[in-house]
UniProtKB/Swiss-Prot annotation:
Expressed at low level in ovary. Residues 14-357, 366-690 form the SAM-dependent MTase PRMT-type domain. The lineage of its organism: Eukaryota, Metazoa, Ecdysozoa, Arthropoda, Hexapoda. This is Protein arginine N-methyltransferase 7. Disulfide bonds: none annotated. Keywords: Methyltransferase, Repeat, S-adenosyl-L-methionine, Transferase. The keyword Repeat applies. It comes from the Eukaryota. GO terms for biological process: chromatin remodeling; peptidyl-arginine methylation; regulation of DNA-templated transcription. Its EC number is 2.1.1.-. Pfam families: PrmA, PRMT_C. Gene3D superfamilies: Hnrnp arginine n-methyltransferase1, Vaccinia Virus protein VP39. Transmembrane segments: none annotated.
Length: 690
C-alpha cells in the first residue's frame, strides 16, 4: 500500500506530492537512528562489556543475585553482554518499535530469546509487577549524547531509582564528569558573529548593525569533531577544568538545575570567546574503567594511543572515533578580553534538565546567569556553517573581485538572488545605481533590512517573487548576481535553484545582462575515510554477538529512504584522495533547462579501499581562465592522490557510501542524470577491477 507525501524540491522550489510506501517514515527513522555508529565504537563496546563482567562478578562474590535492567536496549547488545557476564535475569526496554522488533529477533538468533524479558515501552512507563517481576539491582544504559544530558538522562535516572531499582542498585555507567576549556579562536568565532565586509583594499563596505553586535547569540551547543580543528586555529586560555559531576548511582535525585562558578587564570593573553566542552564516564563503581570523549590534546590515554597508532594515523585521529558522542563549542555571550597571562576571571557554568550554557566575566556575577537567546535574527535564521561562510574572507574576496571589476558606479542595476546575500548587497556600497534583493524569507529579510538601514543604503529594494518584476525593471538590469545560497539547500547542488529562478525571467532579460555565476561544475572524488564510512557500514558481529539481522534491517530501510548522496561537513572526517577529482556535470545558467545524461570512469591512483565518494560544486563567476573566478565548495587546497584532503570548513559536501566496498578496485564508474525542470539530479557509482 502507498501514500502520498508533500515534499519540497530544493532545485525547483516547488512542493509536490510523491508516492511513497506507507512504511516510508519507519524506514527513514530506522536508517537515520544512528545505532550502527554506536556498534562500530569498539571502545564503548569493550568497556561496557568489561564493566558488566567486573560488576556482576563483584555482586556474585558478595552473595547477591543479579537482576539487570537495560534501558534503551537498541539491538539488545548490552542485555546479551549482561547474560554472558552471568546475570540471573535481564529485563530490556525499547520504545522505538522497529528497533524493539529487531532486538527480539537478534536475541533469539543469539540464543537469548527466552532469557531476556523485552518490554516495548519507555522506561518511565514501566510498572514493577506488571511489566517486570521485581526491581532490578543493576542498571545498564546508554542514555547520553554529546551534551550528556540532552536526551533526558536526568529524568530517566531519577525515575528509575524511584520506581524500578532497589535501594542498593548499581549503575553502568556509575558517574560522569563534564569538562570545559576556555579558548580564543578567530576561526571558530566566525561561526557565531558577523564581521564587517570590506573591499579588496580593506575599506569597509557593510558594517553589522548594533543589534548584531549586542546580540548574545544562541546558547545551543555547536557539536563538532573538535580534534579536527587545526591546532593553529585556536589559543587555549585555560587548561581543561571539571565543571559538573553526575552520579548516576546515587539514590538521591539528580538536580535538574545547577550552577557552578569557577575562578580561573588565563595561561596566556587572549579573548575568552568560547568554551570547548566534553565529558567522560566511569563505567564501574571503582572508576577504573574510564571512557573519555576528550579531544586528542586532552585525552588521558594520548601517549599510549599515539605509540600504538601514530604510524598510520595523524595525531588527532589516534584517539577512539565516535560520531554519537562528539565534543561541543559553546560561545561566550560577550567575549572577555584577558590582556595578560595570569589574569583572573570567572567562568559561570549552568545546566538545566537538558542543556548547558556558559558565561565569562571579570567579576563574579551577583545573580544567576540566564540562558541567552538570539535577538538579532542572524543566529535563529542561519546555520553555524552559513554564518561562518558569510565571514569567509578568501571566498568573499573572489566575489568582491568580480563585483568591483564589473559594477559601474551610477550605471549598474543589479538583481540579487538568494537568502542573506550580503555580497550582493555590497554592490550597493560599490556604487550600483539600484539593487533588487530577492528575499522572500521573513527573518532573513528582516536581518538584511536592518543592515541596509544601518549602512544608510538608499538604492535597495526587496522583492518576494522574481516573476512579478515589471518588464521595465527587467529591461534595465545590467547584472544578476548570486553566491548562490538558499535556506532550503542541504546538498551543494540544491543551490541550483538559482537556475530555476533565472528560467522564470529568462525570456524578458536584456541581451547583454551579466549573470554570475555563469556556470557550475560538480566534481567527484573517490576517497578512503578513516572513520566516517562506519555510519553506513554493516556491523556483522560485535563482541562475539551476531548482529547481521540488524544490518539487514538497516540496509532494507536505507535502500528505501536514504539518498544515495548525503551531506556531511568533511573537514571533520579525514579521508585520503584515491585519484584526482573528475567533473561529472557542468551546468550553464544561461541555458539551465538543458537536460544532461553523462557517464565515465575514474582511475584510482592509490591502492586503498574506496569507502566513499565525495562530491561538491565549483561556481564559475565569470568565463575566464583565472582560478580566482572559481568559488569551490570542495577542497580548499589542491588534491594529491594518497594524501589527506583539506576541505572547506564552512559548507557541507555530498558523500556517497558504497554499500559493500571492494578491495583493490582500479576504477570507479559513474553516471549522472540531470533533469533541471523536474529538479531531478541522480548519481550512480560502481566499483570495478580491470
Amino acid at each position: 500500500m502507498s501514500c502520498f507525501s508533500h515534499v519540497m524540491n530544493p532545485i525547483t522550489g516547488q512542493n509536490s506530492w510523491q508516492e511513497r510506501g506507507d512504511d516510508y517514515d519507519y524506514h527513514l527513522e530506522v536508517a537515520n537512528a544512528g545505532f550502527g555508529d554506536m556498534l562500530h565504537d569498539w571502545e564503548r563496546n569493550q568497556k561496557y562489556f568489561a564493566a558488566l563482567r567486573k560488576t556482576i562478578a563483584g555482586m556474585r562474590e558478595a552473595g547477591r543475585e543479579v537482576h539487570v535492567l537495560d534501558i534503551g536496549t537498541g539491538t539488545g547488545i548490552l542485555s546479551m553482554m549482561a547474560l554472558a557476564a552471568g546475570a540471573d535475569s535481564v529485563t530490556a526496554c525499547e520504545a522505538f518499535l522497529p528497533m524493539a522488533n529487531c532486538a527480539e529477533k537478534i536475541l533469539a538468533a543469539n540464543g537469548a530469546g527466552d532469557k531476556v524479558r523485552l518490554i516495548r515501552k519507555r522506561s518511565t512507563e514501566i510498572q514493577v509487577g506488571e511489566d517486570m517481576p521485581r526491581k532490578a539491582n543493576l542498571l545498564v544504559a546508554e542514555l547520553l549524547d554529546t551534551e550528556l544530558i540532552g536526551e533526558g538522562a536526568i529524568g530517566i535516572y531519577n525515575h528509575a531509582h524511584a520506581e524500578l531499582l532497589t535501594e542498593d542498585a548499581l549503575c553502568i555507567p556509575a558517574r560522569a564528569r563534564c569538562y570545559a576549556q576556555v579558548a580564543q579562536s578567530p576561526l571558530a568565532a566566525q561561526w557565531n558573529s558577523l564581521k564587517t565586509i570590506a573591499n579588496l583594499d580593506g575599506e569597509p563596505l557593510l558594517h553589522p548593525p548594533e543589534q548584531l553586535k549586542s546580540c548574545q547569540g544562541e546558547a545551543a551547543l555547536h557539536d563538532v569533531q573538535l580534534s579536527q580543528l587545526p591546532s593553529s586555529a585556536f589559543r587555549p586560555l585555560t587548561d581543561p577544568v571539571e565543571i559538573f559531576q553526575f552520579d548516576f548511582q546515587r539514590k538521591q535525585e539528580r538536580e535538574k538545575q545547577r550552577s557552578q562558578l569557577l575562578k580561573l587564570q588565563s595561561k596566556q593573553p587572549g579573548a575568552a570567546e568560547l568554551v570547548f566542552y566534553w565529558w567522560d564516564i566511569q563505567l564501574d563503581d571503582d572508576g577504573e574503567i574510564l571512557l573519555s570523549c576528550a579531544p586528542y590534546w586532552a585525552h588521558p590515554q594520548l601517549k599510549e594511543l599515539a605509540a600504538e597508532k601514530a604510524k598510520d594515523h595523524p595525531l588527532p585521529n589516534v584517539v577512539p572515533w565516535r560520531d554519537h558522542w562528539m565534543q561541543a563549542i559553546y560561545y561566550i555571550p560577550k567575549p572577555l578580553q584577558l590582556l595578560e597571562a595570569g589574569k583572573s576571571f570567572h567562568l559561570s557554568c549552568h545546566h538545566d534538565e537538558y542543556s548547558l550554557w556558559f558565561d565569562a566575566r571579570e567579576e563574579a556575577p551577583t545573580k544567576s546567569v540566564r540562558r541567552h537567546t538570539c535577538t538579532c535574527d542572524l543566529h535563529m535564521t542561519y546555520s553555524r556553517s552559513r554564518i561562518g561562510q558569510l565571514n569567509q574572507s578568501p571566498r568573499n574576496k573572489r566575489y568582491l573581485r568580480y563585483l568591483e571589476e564589473s559594477i559601474e558606479a551610477e550605471k549598474s542595476n543589479v538583481l540579487v538572488l538568494g537568502n542573506g546575500c550580503l555580497l550582493g548587497l555590497a554592490s550597493s556600497a560599490l556604487g550600483a545605481a539600484s539593487v533588487l534583493l530577492h528575499e522572500p524569507h521573513r527573518f532573513s529579510r528582516r536581518l538584511i533590512e536592518s543592515i541596509v538601514k544601518h549602512n544608510q543604503l538608499k538604492n535597495v529594494q526587496f522583492l518576494d517573487k522574481v516573476e512579478e518584476l515589471e518588464d521595465s525593471r527587467l529591461a534595465a538590469l545590467t547584472h544578476i548576481f548570486a553566491e548562490p545560497y538558499f535556506l532550503n539547500a542541504i546538498l551543494p547542488w540544491d543551490n541550483f535553484y538559482f537556475g530555476t529562478l533565472l528560467t522564470k525571467i529568462k525570456d524578458r532579460l536584456p541581451e547583454g545582462v551579466k549573470i554570475s555565476p555563469c556556470s557550475a561544475r560538480i566534481y567527484a572524488l573517490p576517497v578512503e575515510f578513516l572513520d566516517l564510512h562506519k555510519i553506513r557500514a554493516p556491523v556483522g558481529s560485535c563482541e562475539g554477538f551476531d548482529l547481521r539481522l540488524f544490518d539487514e534491517m538497516v540496509e532494507r530501510s536505507a535502500e528505501q529512504a536514504v539518498s544515495l548522496v548525503e551531506a556531511q561537513p568533511l573537514w571533520e572526517y579525514p579521508c585520503r584522495a584515491l585519484s584526482e577529482p573528475q567533473e561529472v556535470l557542468s551546468v550553464d545558467f544561461s541555458n539551465f533547462g538543458q537536460e544532461h545524461s553523462l557517464k565515465g570512469s575514474i582511475e584510482l591512483k592509490h591502492p586503498r579501499i574506496c569507502n566513499g565518494v565525495a562530491l561538491w560544486v565549483d561556481w564559475q563567476l565569470v568565463e575566464d581562465n583565472s582560478p580566482r573566478s572559481i568559488v569551490s565548495s570542495g577542497p580548499s587546497e589542491p588534491v594529491v592522490p594518497g594524501e589527506f584532503v583539506k576541505w572547506d570548513m564552512f559548507v557541507r559536501q555530498g558523500v556517497h557510501f558504497p554499500r559493500r566496498p571492494k578491495e583493490a578496485i582500479t576504477h570507479l564508474e559513474w553516471s549522472t542524470v540531470f533533469k533541471p525542470l523536474l529538479g531531478e539530479l541522480t548519481f550512480s557509482f560502481g566499483q570495478k577491477k580491470l
